[in-house]
Curated annotation (Swiss-Prot):
PANTHER family named among the record's database cross-references: UPF0276 PROTEIN HI_1600
Organism: Rhizobium rhizogenes (strain K84 / ATCC BAA-868)
Residues making up the signal peptide according to the UniProt record: none
Pfam families named among the record's database cross-references: MbnB_TglH_ChrH
Name listed for the protein in its UniProt record: UPF0276 protein Arad_4857
Highest taxon in the source lineage: Bacteria
Gene3D superfamilies reported for this sequence: Divalent-metal-dependent TIM barrel enzymes
Classification via InterPro entries: MbnB/TglH/ChrH, Xyl_isomerase-like_sf
Family in the record: Belongs to the UPF0276 family.
Length: 284
């Protein structure tokens, strides 16, 4: 099984509207990430641009539609299309979410949470084994942004993720914004969560912006919206994390209200500066 092996640099999510600016620059970022489902067609401009990009950059393919956390079988047609994409581009990394988005023949346009129980643990592990066997590559599993908790849960999320890694050999994608969003929504301490997270298995980090609102009781409610710059509390958590772990491949996500390329590149440069400082401290 091919391991995940992105460079320990800062990358960004690739947006086709940025292609010309990227093509004119000299290695502006460490790697790019794309959503697998956007490249499941056979050809056309998306593939032409990504093929050109792939000649010069490391690539992470990030899935959003496998429904790893579903209690029903994985969609084998979707899996087959995913394999075609991965075989075509040979990415340095493939990742998916600890979430579900299908029910019978209904496909939901969201990543929904699941209770953490022995039953769901067994099902998620079986699904990951199926994916990794088909792709012959290690999959990274991303911690979710959540807006509710389940009374049925009997396992802490960090323990749930650690046990998945132990059983399947997958790696983890640690989304720092998701940690901050979920911790705020559930009135928990994000630093306590990160202190318990199995960081030794993290092969990629995600950073993104979130939107702020209030719930019906007037309490703060954060939405993992990917439509703004990374907020200061998330940067602070990230810098503390990297000081502890050392450099890890780190991706800036900005999927909605996408800015001009220089704005996105500046976010990646800020992450890259944190990575370099951590590397320098370790080398000293």
């Amino acid at each position: 099984m091919k391991p995940s092996e992105l460079p320990h640099r800062a990358g960004v999510g690739f947006k086709p509207e940025h292609f010309s600016a990227i093509d004119a620059a000299a290695q502006p970022v460490g790697f790019f990430e794309v959503h697998a489902e956007n490249y499941m067609g056979a050809g056309g401009p998306p593939h032409a641009k990504l093929s050109k990009l792939r000649q010069d950059y490391a690539l992470s393919i990030h899935g959003v539609g496998l429904s790893i956390g579903s209690m029903q079988p994985l969609d084998t047609d979707h899996l087959a299309r995913l394999k075609i994409v991965c075989d075509r581009y040979e990415p340095e990394s493939f990742s998916e979410h600890l979430a579900w988005s299908t029910h019978d023949t209904t496909f939901l346009n969201d990543l929904l949470p699941l209770p953490y129980t022995e039953m769901t643990l067994t099902q998620v592990c079986a699904h990951i084994d199926q994916v990794q066997t088909l792709l012959d590559r290690q999959m990274l599993l991303e911690n979710p942004a959540t807006y509710l908790l389940f009374e049925q849960s009997t396992i802490e999320e960090t323990d749930f993720l650690a046990e998945i890694v132990r059983r399947t050999g997958c790696g983890l994608l640690l989304d720092v914004n998701n940690v901050f969003v979920a911790s705020t929504n559930h009135h928990m301490d994000p630093r306590d969560y990160l202190s318990r997270f199995p960081v030794e298995w993290v092969r990629e980090i995600h950073l993104s912006g979130h939107s702020e609102t209030v719930d019906d009781a007037g309490a703060p409610l954060l939405i993992d919206s990917h439509d703004t710059a990374i907020k200061d509390p998330v940067w602070a958590l990230y810098e503390e994390l990297i000081a502890r772990t050392g450099p890890i491949a780190s991706l800036v996500e900005w999927d909605n209200d996408v800015p001009e390329w220089p704005v996105l590149r500046a976010e990646a440069e800020a992450a890259g500066a944190i990575l370099r400082r951590a590397a320098d401290r370790r080398a000293a």
